[in-house]
């Protein structure tokens, strides 16, 4: 009996302890109502290094007969000075034709001073509504009196003034989120395809009848909620947040045309969407606008081959019209006005390119795409909002060109890197042919490095290097140089090695797209760790393979290298008189289990020189996160082999 009693007491005690230690369950609160504990909080308990965190983000969405409304209330905790950037808020929306509108904005800062809660409201006159372009607007405001420890909150109403509109919802942000909740009242007049892109389980996921009046069921009430969501962090070789952030999406697939009608499917095909766009005067109408530039067209027509004409027109447009840094799949000003102003968005610039190619007798076609940051196209979701740019497609003999003249570093003979490994919507307006086409580059992007150096007895490596960059490596090098300037770019080539000094740097073939960018470098490196007896050096120079990008134990996103890549690193190092080779790395090969990546190292001695050859080849550009363990293990071994030292001993 005493044993049974003891067991009973132990069980009760265990339940009591669990009840005492169980983490509190947080939800949303009314505007202005706040727990003192949130004001006194100094860190995020599930992400200690966070600068700010979302305490809660709640949306209540209700569908009506002709419009949808969303009431949103968001509260953020500022944890330190770096988190104060969250106090500047921008809400963008699609305002054309009155499709969307933001109203009833309310915002305030909450502080605690000697246990007294203080509220500082944002002056309504300092809440600005501005036009971004003729299609989009934004609401902007900044919170006053913000300091570490402050809580800021805002609420607003978003109205979608079109039948069946429904906003998507992001559970995850670039700062941690303690609680995120979407409540939706959806009338039975509408049917949506609900697409969850989450890997963390919901804390709440319910469906209940939506009842109005005494017993009138008009639809369903849904709740989706998640708690303690870690901040979204960019991972090496990942596409944009749009592909990887945890969210839920809604696509209207059916609705009733009358109060007592039957539900009809309305999901449009890609062909129907494309056809409607081509027939739209603001889009398709611009394809037939004729831009006058007799000099450009005459010069293009004087060239012998179509290939030369394509190259000339592409570079002329690229170098004449400045991109305003906006990737859009619509036109704001129209091609004639953009050509006059010499500045426009991505689609406007490429429509100008399309126009001139047509005038020069080159058959070409518009093609919608989504850029890397905008997110990959989900082919089963027939929604034009997945696209954010238009490019020009040209077929010349056996070669396909995808031309984007908005980026000044793009070339006519390489597919735009920003569009690789996703599908575009190809359009042939004349034949009413509209189809999805997947874009990938089968040709490897190559980088070839030659190092010729002499090892000095005093522990210094001195010599020259030549780097030949092909395709996307060429484009990336030109972009980095143009963005950083020569001094910072040469620092980049040093890969944070303070013992490496670049004495001179020269470039060749910067203006010729068909030739590799050649970089000639004279350098000197102090071989630290060397002493009176031994010299140690690592031949992994100017390779861009100094730091392993895949050290994390887990991976949340697909690895997308963009292109398949090939690297060849060759070195010849002269051994100083009075020294002998004490230790050389062995010649070895490494291969991924599926043979998608190979690494080969050959090290040998020849006539008093050390010859080093590294070869890295990729057979594919995409690796799913399920393949990450294999990638991580391969890279760990490869970097160990790349960074293995050569040892010389004094005779």
Regions found by a protein language model. Give the residues of each.
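Hydrophobic alpha-helix feature that most strongly marks membrane-spanning transmembrane helices
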Residues: 318, 322, 358, 457, ...
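Active-site neighborhood of thiol-dependent amide/isopeptide-bond enzymes
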Residues: 135, 297-395, 412
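Conserved, compact domain cores that house catalytic/ligand-binding motifs in diverse enzymes
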Residues: 283-291, 308, 313, 346, ...
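Acidic low-complexity segments
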Residues: 237-323, 331-332
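Extended, non-catalytic structural segments that build the interaction scaffolds
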Residues: 297-301, 449-450, 556-561
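Bacterial Sec-dependent N-terminal signal peptides
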Residues: 1-25, 651
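Beta-strand-rich, non-transmembrane domain signature
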Residues: 20-275, 292, 351-354, 364-517, ...
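A carboxyl-terminal module marker
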Residues: 492-651
């Amino acid at each position: 009996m005493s044993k049974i009693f003891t067991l009973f007491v132990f069980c009760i005690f265990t339940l009591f302890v669990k009840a005492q230690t169980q983490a509190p369950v947080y939800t949303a609160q009314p505007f202005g109502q706040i727990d003192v504990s949130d004001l006194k909080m100094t860190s995020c308990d599930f992400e200690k290094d966070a600068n700010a965190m979302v305490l809660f983000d709640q949306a209540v969405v209700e569908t009506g007969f002709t419009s949808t409304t969303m009431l949103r209330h968001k509260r953020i905790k500022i944890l330190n000075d770096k988190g104060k950037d969250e106090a500047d808020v921008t809400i963008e929306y699609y305002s054309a034709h009155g499709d969307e509108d933001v109203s009833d904005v309310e915002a305030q800062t909450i502080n605690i001073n000697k246990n007294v809660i203080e509220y500082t409201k944002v002056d309504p006159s300092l809440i600005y509504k501005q036009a971004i372009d003729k299609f989009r607007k934004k609401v902007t405001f900044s919170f006053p009196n913000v300091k570490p420890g402050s809580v800021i909150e805002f609420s607003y109403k978003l109205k979608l003034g079109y039948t069946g509109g429904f906003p998507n919802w992001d559970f995850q942000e670039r700062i941690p989120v303690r609680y995120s909740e979407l409540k939706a009242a959806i009338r039975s007049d509408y049917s949506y395809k609900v697409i969850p892109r989450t890997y963390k389980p919901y804390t709440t996921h319910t469906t209940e009848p939506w009842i109005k009046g005494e017993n009138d069921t008009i639809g369903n009430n849904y709740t989706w909620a998640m708690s303690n969501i870690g901040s979204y962090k960019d991972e090496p070789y990942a596409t944009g947040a749009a592909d990887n952030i945890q969210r839920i999406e809604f696509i209207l697939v059916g609705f009733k045309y009358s109060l007592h009608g039957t539900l009809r499917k309305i999901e449009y095909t890609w062909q129907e969407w494309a056809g409607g766009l081509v027939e739209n005067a603001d889009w398709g109408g611009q394809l037939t606008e004729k831009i006058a530039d007799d000099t450009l067209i005459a010069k293009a027509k004087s060239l012998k081959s179509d290939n030369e004409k394509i190259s000339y027109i592409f570079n002329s447009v690229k170098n004449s019209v400045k991109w305003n840094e906006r990737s859009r799949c619509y036109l704001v000003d129209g091609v004639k006005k953009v050509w006059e102003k010499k500045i426009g968005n991505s689609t406007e610039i490429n429509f100008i390119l399309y126009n001139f190619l047509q005038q020069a007798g080159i058959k070409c076609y518009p093609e919608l795409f989504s850029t890397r940051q905008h997110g990959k196209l989900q082919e089963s979701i027939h929604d034009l909002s997945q696209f954010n740019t238009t490019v020009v497609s040209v077929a010349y003999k056996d070669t396909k060109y995808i031309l984007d003249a908005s980026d000044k570093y793009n070339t006519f003979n390489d597919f735009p890197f920003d569009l690789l490994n996703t599908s575009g919507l190809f359009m042939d307006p004349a034949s009413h042919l509209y189809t999805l086409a997947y874009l990938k580059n089968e040709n490897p992007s190559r980088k070839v490095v030659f190092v010729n150096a002499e090892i000095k007895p005093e522990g210094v490596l001195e010599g020259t290097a030549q780097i030949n960059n092909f395709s996307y490596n060429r484009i990336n090098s030109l972009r980095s140089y143009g963005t950083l300037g020569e001094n910072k770019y040469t620092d980049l080539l040093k890969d944070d090695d303070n013992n490496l000094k670049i004495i001179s740097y020269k470039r060749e073939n910067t203006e010729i797209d068909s030739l590799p960018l050649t970089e000639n470098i004279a350098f000197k490196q102090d071989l630290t760790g060397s002493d009176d007896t031994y010299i140690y050096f690592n031949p992994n120079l100017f390779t861009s393979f100094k730091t392993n990008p895949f050290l994390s134990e887990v991976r949340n996103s697909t690895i997308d290298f963009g292109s398949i890549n090939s690297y060849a690193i060759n070195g010849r190092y002269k051994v100083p008189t009075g020294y002998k080779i004490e230790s050389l790395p062995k010649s070895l090969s490494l291969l991924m289990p599926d043979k998608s990546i190979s690494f080969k190292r050959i090290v040998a001695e020849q006539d008093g020189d050390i010859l080093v050859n590294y070869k890295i080849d990729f057979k594919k550009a995409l690796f799913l996160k399920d393949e990450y363990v294999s990638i991580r293990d391969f890279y760990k071994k490869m970097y160990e082999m790349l960074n293995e030292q050569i040892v010389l001993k004094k005779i």
